[in-house]
A protein has these predicted regions:
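Bacterial N-terminal signal peptides
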Residues: 9-19
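C-terminal partner/receptor-binding element of secreted or periplasmic proteins
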Residues: 132-161
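N-terminal segment of the mature soluble domain
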Residues: 37-91
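Boundary at the C-terminal end of the N-terminal hydrophobic targeting segment
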Residues: 20-24
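Amphipathic beta-strand/beta-sheet edge segments enriched in Tyr/Trp
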Residues: 98-138
Length: 161
């Protein structure tokens, strides 16, 4: 009985000495260039691929519903994503990831790029931005793997932040 008690106390002590914490990351995917009537699975596919990688890396992940815009805003995003950013911040997110899934024209069902921007919710500063090719997979399964590969690049870049 004493051995069990000692092991339990040692585990508890280790947990107190080395606190376990994970950063919380909130995702918002915005499809740009499509008409409102267009139907595509790529937004959900990219969102899932990116979120899976972050989750597997130990982050707590949340998301907002996929949105649509006629075109990607140039710089100031506050008028477009302010509510989603505010909700993520109130929920305790440390980072806010925006993925602009860009389509060449309104009739296209295949995207050509995914522009990912990551903001620190405490400072509201852009800490990462990169464009990834999208729509290059021969099928949805391959496209999902492309999204996951992009997520791995992003997660590896976040380790130093």
């Amino acid at each position: 009985m004493n051995n069990k008690r000692l092991v339990s106390m040692a585990v508890l002590l280790l947990l107190l000495i080395f606190p376990v914490s994970a950063s919380m990351v909130s995702f918002l995917v915005i499809e740009t260039g499509l008409s409102e009537e267009s139907v595509t699975q790529y937004g959900s596919l990219w969102e899932g691929g990116l979120m899976d990688v972050f989750f597997d890396a130990g982050h707590i992940v949340t998301n907002s519903p996929i949105a649509r815009m006629e075109k990607r805003p140039a710089e100031d995003l506050s008028g477009y994503i302010g509510v989603d950013f505010y909700e993520a911040t109130r929920s305790g997110a440390d980072y806010f990831v925006i993925g602009f899934l860009e389509f060449k024209n309104k009739d296209s069902h295949v995207p050509n790029a995914m522009i990912v921007k990551i903001y620190n919710t405490n400072t509201e500063k852009l800490i990462f931005e990169r464009s990834f090719p999208a729509g290059t997979g021969r099928n949805l399964g391959e496209e999902y793997q492309i999204a996951k590969s992009a997520g791995q690049v992003i997660v590896s870049n976040m380790k130093g932040m």
